[in-house]
């Protein structure tokens, strides 16, 4: 027997049934996708779909060459034809903005776009963290004021309500100011951290040289006291940045959205400025961040477009749905409305015709394949979760009738004329 080929570690199959080490099903995932589609339409966002492979230079320029994502986590390879360096996308914002710039989508008006799809990072797989993971992203492009910052946070809070997990999520916010303010803070931070360099772990020493702001994001408990006493970026904000942040917080207050100000919240990508935020939970162990984002006012220009202030966020679907599956609510109905059975010569063709007619009227119908006893077929109908069973046997063929059974028992079992099949089932379904 040939050896089985396994999936790549950290990359999961999505099946009709739960797996031992991956509890999400395709039906649960589809129900979430349907919810996201309705949610984004309600806020006026249009979907965009981009390739999963991009030129590596896109991520070097946007995310930052010295970030962990670009430096350690991307899947990068050379195109065999022209040695062009390509990478599987590690996040969605850069790809979305590349498409916006390439196709000049901002030529006459701002854009509200959303995307959903797989991302790839070479990380150590664990619960809530995978090498292939999926994100939903929201990008509001060409909007400058703090009102859009507050709106997209309200938008995310609305989704948490729909999924029944709002009480399990905490909003953390911060302001990173503009480029000049960050540069002044960076100089003070480097001077401060250098005094403690002998106490820093190896990862923090590396970040001190490449991206010192990320040192403040360390999870090392031995460094918390040093980080807590470090210069705060908020103390380096100029008047414009302060006003933006104050107005943003006032809008959150007016919307009744509670938040925690976290001066050490910096996010892991270099393109952020001004408003940044994360939604976190204490229900998923170490993987606390479910959703995060912020402003990236200079990124479109960095990618070759005209300056356009913008803001966005992304949520990890696997992590979010693990939270929903344990604590939230999401209506999942993968079962068919009708299980169609047949018995005897000619009944298989007739039941196929009935099934097609029912599907044309909006019923989901699973038709039995093969030739088994009605008892065996009824057992399969029960296992399918169908609400109704449709039976066509020799008596029904001869009399031009069908037998219907309500699997929940409300309407019992009835034999009706074939022409009454659809209206009877519609009446039962709506009762």
Curated annotation (Swiss-Prot):
Primary location: cytoplasm
Reaction catalysed by this enzyme: tRNA(His) + L-histidine + ATP = L-histidyl-tRNA(His) + AMP + diphosphate + H(+)
One GO term of the biological process aspect: histidyl-tRNA aminoacylation
EC number(s) per entry: 6.1.1.21
SUPFAM superfamilies (alphabetical): Class II aaRS ABD-related (SSF52954), Class II aaRS and biotin synthetases (SSF55681)
Keyword annotations from UniProtKB, A to Z: Aminoacyl-tRNA synthetase, ATP-binding, Cytoplasm, Ligase, Nucleotide-binding, Protein biosynthesis
Family indicated by similarity: Belongs to the class-II aminoacyl-tRNA synthetase family.
Class of this enzyme: ligase
Keyword Aminoacyl-tRNA synthetase applies: yes
GO molecular function: ATP binding; histidine-tRNA ligase activity
Signal peptide range: none
Organism domain of life: Bacteria
Entry protein name: Histidine--tRNA ligase
S-S bridge residues: none
Subcellular locations according to the entry: Cytoplasm
Stored NCBIfam families: hisS
GO cellular component, one term: cytoplasm
Assembly mode: Homodimer.
């Amino acid at each position: 027997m040939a050896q089985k080929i396994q999936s790549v570690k950290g990359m999961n199959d999505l099946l009709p049934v739960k797996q031992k080490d991956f509890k999400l099903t395709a039906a649960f995932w589809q129900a979430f996708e349907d919810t996201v589609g309705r949610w984004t339409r309600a806020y006026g966002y249009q979907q965009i779909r981009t390739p999963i492979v991009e030129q590596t230079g896109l991520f070097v320029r946007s995310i930052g060459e010295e970030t962990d994502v670009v430096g350690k986590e991307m899947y990068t390879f050379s195109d065999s034809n022209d040695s062009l360096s390509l990478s599987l996308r590690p996040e969605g914002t850069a790809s979305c903005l590349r498409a916006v710039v390439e196709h000049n989508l901002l030529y006459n008006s701002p854009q509200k776009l959303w995307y959903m799809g797989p991302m790839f990072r070479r990380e150590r797989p664990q619960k809530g963290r995978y090498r292939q993971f999926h994100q939903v992203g929201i990008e509001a492009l060409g909007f400058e004021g703090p009102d859009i910052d507050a709106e997209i946070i309200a938008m995310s809070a609305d989704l948490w309500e729909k999924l029944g997990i709002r009480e399990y999520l905490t909003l953390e916010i911060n302001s990173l100011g503009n480029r000049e303010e960050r540069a002044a803070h960076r100089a003070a931070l480097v001077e401060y951290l250098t005094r403690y360099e002998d106490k820093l772990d190896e990862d923090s020493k590396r970040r001190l040289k490449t991206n010192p702001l990320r040192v403040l994001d360390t999870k090392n408990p031995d460094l918390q006291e040093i980080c807590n006493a470090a210069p705060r970026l908020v103390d380096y904000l100029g008047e414009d940045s302060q006003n933006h942040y104050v107005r943003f917080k006032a809008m959150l207050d007016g919307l009744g959205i509670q938040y925690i100000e976290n001066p050490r919240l910096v996010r892991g990508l270099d393109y952020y400025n001004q408003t940044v935020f994360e939604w976190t939970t204490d229900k998923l162990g170490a993987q606390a961040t479910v959703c995060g984002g912020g402003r990236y006012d200079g990124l479109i220009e960095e990618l070759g477009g005209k300056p356009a202030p913008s803001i966005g966020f992304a949520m990890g679907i696997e992590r979010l749905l693990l939270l929903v599956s344990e604590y939230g609510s999401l209506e999942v109905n993968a079962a068919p409305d009708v299980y169609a059975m047949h018995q005897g010569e000619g009944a298989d063709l007739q039941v196929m015709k009935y099934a097609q007619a029912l599907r044309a009227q909006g019923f989901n119908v699973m038709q039995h394949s093969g030739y088994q006893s009605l008892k065996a077929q009824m057992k399969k109908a029960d296992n399918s979760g169908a609400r109704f069973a449709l039976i066509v046997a020799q008596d029904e063929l001869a009399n031009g009738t069908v037998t219907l059974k309500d699997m929940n028992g409300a309407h019992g079992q009835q034999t009706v004329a074939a022409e009454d099949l659809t209206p009877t089932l519609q009446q039962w379904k709506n009762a």
